[in-house]
Amino acid sequence: MNTMIGFIVLLVSATVLGDPELDALRKELDERFDMEFKDGPMSEIQEKLFLQELEALDSELLEDDPQTDTYENSNFREKRCSGSDTPCYKGSKMCCRGLECTEPALYGIWYKSYFCKRPKKG
């Protein structure tokens, strides 16, 4: 019981006294905000000029960056395709590069489907 009374007294004293630095921090932030914007907000013309300058700088930086091309190309991948000995539909182009959708061979007869195979050189 004595312990609970002690904690309650501590809680009440902490809430009453509070954080004295909190008011000082608020005042400091208000002063900084006033110093930053003491000239008032920018006019629309100034904002547009500033935006144009930023866009020009941005475009110059991106043009000189050699990594943008390689980054875009590294994410490119071929469309999904069927590998060797995988079923396909007659006349479809779903087989990977270098493979053709050919008539079923021995085991393909059982499944009645075509398979992606390398073309026979002849």
Swiss-Prot record:
Keywords: Cleavage on pair of basic residues, Disulfide bond, Ion channel impairing toxin, Secreted, Signal, Toxin. Residues 19-80 form a propeptide. InterPro entries: Toxin_22. One of its GO terms (molecular function) is sodium channel inhibitor activity. GO terms for cellular component: extracellular region. It comes from the Eukaryota. Disulfide bonds join C81-C96, C88-C101, C95-C116. It holds the Pfam family Toxin_22. It is found in: Secreted. Expressed by the venom gland. Residues 1-18 form the signal peptide. The presence of a 'disulfide through disulfide knot' structurally defines this protein as a knottin. Probable ion channel inhibitor. This is U19-hexatoxin-Hi1a. The lineage of its organism: Eukaryota, Metazoa, Ecdysozoa, Arthropoda, Chelicerata.
